[in-house]
């Protein structure tokens, strides 16, 4: 278990409602680096090899599990760009808790650009929660720039007009 400093713990309490712990499926990114992560039986997290970020694989047997992937920036002048891709298999039931908190007590801009892409299988139930938070007594900006892309299979019932 990684020992977290008071700033990181305080920011995590806000963006994850005091629920983050280093158990189950999780990945904590701090100041541009993944500092700890864990897998569960049905959720596996792999570090990307071609760009910053992670791939999260959620198998179809996942039933009511949660995965936490918070980011904390506490250095002034830091820019963090991350690509997180979620692969949710058919029939999975999962809660994904993301979010970023910036503590900036300096005079330079601190920025997090988080790009999340979801590939959702048939009959999967995904609850996605994302919180963003900025604090600090410095004059530097706290910029949070999330992007969310979702790819899924949709089934629509034929309308009366389509049925003839």
PLM feature spans:
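Conserved beta-strand/loop scaffold segments within soluble protein domains that form the structured core
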Residues: 27, 35-157, 161
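Short, Gly/Pro- and small/polar-rich lid/capping loops
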Residues: 1-40
């Amino acid at each position: 278990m990684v020992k977290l400093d008071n700033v990181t713990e305080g920011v995590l309490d806000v963006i994850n409602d005091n629920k983050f712990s280093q158990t189950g499926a999780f990945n904590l990114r701090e100041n541009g680096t993944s500092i700890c992560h864990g897998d569960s039986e049905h959720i596996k997290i792999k570090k990307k090899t071609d760009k910053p970020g992670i791939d999260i694989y959620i198998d179809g047997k996942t039933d009511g599990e949660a995965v936490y992937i918070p980011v904390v920036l506490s250095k002034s002048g830091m820019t963090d760009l991350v690509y997180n891709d979620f692969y949710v298999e058919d029939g999975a039931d999962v809660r994904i808790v993301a979010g970023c908190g910036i503590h900036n007590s300096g005079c330079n801009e601190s920025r997090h650009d988080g790009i999340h892409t979801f590939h959702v299988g048939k009959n999967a139930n995904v609850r996605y929660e994302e919180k963003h938070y900025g604090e600090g007594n410095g004059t530097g900006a706290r910029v949070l720039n999330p992007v969310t892309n979702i790819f899924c299979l949709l089934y629509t019932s034929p309308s009366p007009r389509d049925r003839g």
